[in-house]
Structures are given as structure tokens and as C-alpha cells.
């Protein structure tokens, strides 16, 4: 069995609706199985011309430079794909998010698909898997975990 490594992911987006929002910033941190940081990644892309950002998103993350600066969304998603595939060549990756199953993972799938990339990259490649810390915390600290 291959050694496991963890990839902690977070996104900043143009809104909360996963059908219409765009990822404009992705942060990923690769750690070994003892959570020692091996590599960090911070990617930004310009907002696509047909995406209408919500005011609330920009009030939250303050990423206004992405309106005019950064790489193209296509380039960002392909760079991310290549980086994650590189990290996973010799290790089984566990992608870790907070509320990722309902938000970040949905955005990754849609936007990988938009850019002609396998939408199941975080679960279908070299034994990769994922975990949502929000689900674990809800199970540990609430009596009515959903």
C-alpha cells in the first residue's frame, strides 16, 4: 500500500451557488502522514467574462485583484490538475476540506469539467480519497449531526 499524504484545500469564489460561481483562488497544502508541510500552492485566476460575482463574496474574501489580474481560469485549473497528479504519483492523497463535500468538491468537479479535466480527480486517481472536516466536527460535537 502506498504511503498516504494529505492535501488541505480551500477556495475563494465569486459566490455561494455552485452552479454559477467560479473559483478565483485555490490554496492547497501537501503534508506527509505526520502532517509535516511538504509543499504549498496558492493560485489565482481572473474572473471569467460571463460570471457575475456576488457582492457578499467580495466583502468576505476581499480578492478584488482577481477582477483584472491573475492567470486564466483554464490555466489555473490545469496547473492545479498537474500539481495534484504530481503529488499523487507515489502517494495516496487524502484531500481534506471544511464543508468541501457540499461546496469545494462540487466546484472542483464542475470547473474541472468546464476545462476538459476529469471531474473526479480527487477520488478516482491512484487511490485518492477525500474527507470533510465539517462532517467530522458535527459528528463529534453535536447531538443531531446531519
Predicted feature locations:
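Histidine/lysine/aspartate-rich catalytic loop segments that bind and position anionic ligands
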Residues: 124-140
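Conserved non-catalytic scaffold segment of RNase H-like nuclease domains
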Residues: 2-112
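Conserved small/polar residues in nucleotide/adenosyl-binding loops
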Residues: 141-146
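Substrate-recognition/cap helix-loop segment adjacent to the acidic, metal-dependent catalytic center
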Residues: 104-128
Amino acid at each position: 500500500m502506498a504511503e498516504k499524504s494529505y492535501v488541505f484545500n480551500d477556495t475563494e469564489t465569486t459566490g455561494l451557488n455552485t452552479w454559477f460561481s467560479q473559483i478565483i483562488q485555490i490554496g492547497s497544502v501537501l503534508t506527509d502522514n505526520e502532517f509535516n508541510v511538504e509543499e504549498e500552492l496558492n493560485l489565482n485566476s481572473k474572473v471569467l467574462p460571463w460570471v457575475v460575482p456576488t457582492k457578499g463574496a467580495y466583502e468576505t474574501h476581499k480578492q478584488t485583484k482577481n477582477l483584472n489580474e491573475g492567470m486564466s481560469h483554464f490555466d489555473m485549473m490545469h496547473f492545479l490538475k498537474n500539481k495534484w497528479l504530481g503529488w499523487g504519483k507515489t502517494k495516496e492523497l487524502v484531500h481534506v476540506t471544511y464543508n468541501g463535500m457540499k461546496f469545494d468538491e462540487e466546484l472542483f468537479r464542475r470547473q474541472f469539467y468546464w476545462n476538459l479535466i476529469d471531474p473526479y480527480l480527487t477520488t478516482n486517481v491512484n487511490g485518492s480519497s477525500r474527507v470533510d472536516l465539517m462532517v467530522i466536527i458535527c459528528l463529534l460535537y453535536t447531538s443531531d449531526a446531519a
